[in-house]
Regions:
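Conserved glycine-rich cofactor-binding loop
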Residues: 14-15
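Substrate-binding pocket helix/loop in short-chain dehydrogenase/reductase
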Residues: 89-91, 95-100
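Active-site helix of classical SDR
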Residues: 114, 149
Length: 250
């Protein structure tokens, strides 16, 4: 008796949570289409595991998203992970173009990707897992653009859950708190690595692998189980303004 190999598409797969998720899925026997803008990094990722196939993707470009759908005519799982935060400006000082970029990548990019892959997901009675954030439920000063985008992701998850329930497609969200990834905070601070490192100072933060483990767990529940939301945080983070920072152990 043979078992058909399942296919997963992971966006934002060139680094961080996306790359870790692609690895975890491939380790469990999935055929993984790892999609992102940086093909050099995807090539290195696919070299690690024969089950990972790179695919160039810019989620802000409809033609690029259509090409992704052509590259994955069969799809059992979409991990819509592409997104970003590009500023920490207050609402009074915010640059509208920066907010538009955040929304285009994080929200509209997710919409484009889901739309393109939905026929394949419906055919397989598959699953959509959105990478959310505690920023989709918590708010903080200077985070308005990113917070609004991640609140929108939470709303998309709720909407898709209602709209796809009759099709058999499952819809889930994995929403991490503080995750120490090499690039996320550095991009947000305009490349100032010292400021980026200070975000996680004294905190045993989540890793990309921690979040990937949660995504893979959600994606491997029995078909009759829909995990609506998994929110995970470091033990030291009980809220956006409740983070216990401890000095490093000698």
């Amino acid at each position: 008796m043979t078992t058909t190999q399942r296919t997963a598409v992971v966006t934002g797969a060139s680094s961080g949570i996306g790359a870790a998720t692609a690895r975890r899925l491939a380790e469990q026997g999935w055929a993984v289409v790892a999609a992102a803008r940086r093909l050099d990094r995807l090539g290195a990722l696919s070299a690690e595991h024969p089950g990972i196939r790179p695919c160039a993707l810019d989620v802000t470009d409809p033609r690029s998203v259509e090409a992704l759908a052509d590259a994955a005519p069969s799809c059992d799982l979409l991990v819509a992970n592409a997104g970003g935060a590009f500023d920490l400006a207050t609402l009074a000082d915010a640059d509208v173009d920066t907010w538009a970029r955040t929304y285009d990548v994080t929200v509209l990019g997710t919409v484009r990707t889901v739309q393109a892959l939905l026929p394949a997901l419906q055919a397989s009675r598959g699953q959509v897992v959105l990478t959310g954030s505690t920023a989709g439920r918590w708010v903080y000063e200077g985070g308005g653009g990113y917070v609004a985008a991640k609140h929108a992701i939470a709303a998309l998850r709720d909407t898709l859950r209602l709209e796809l329930v009759e099709s058999g497609v499952r819809v889930s969200e994995v929403a991490p708190g503080m995750v120490a990834t090499p690039e996320f905070s550095a991009v947000r601070f305009g490349g100032d690595q010292d400021k980026a490192d200070a975000v996680y100072a004294g905190v045993d933060a989540l890793t990309a692998e921690d979040v990937a483990d949660a995504i893979v767990w959600v994606a491997t529940r029995p078909a009759h189980v829909n995990v609506d939301l998994v929110q995970l945080t470091p033990q030291q983070q009980a809220g956006v303004h409740k983070v216990v920072r401890r000095p490093p152990t000698p």
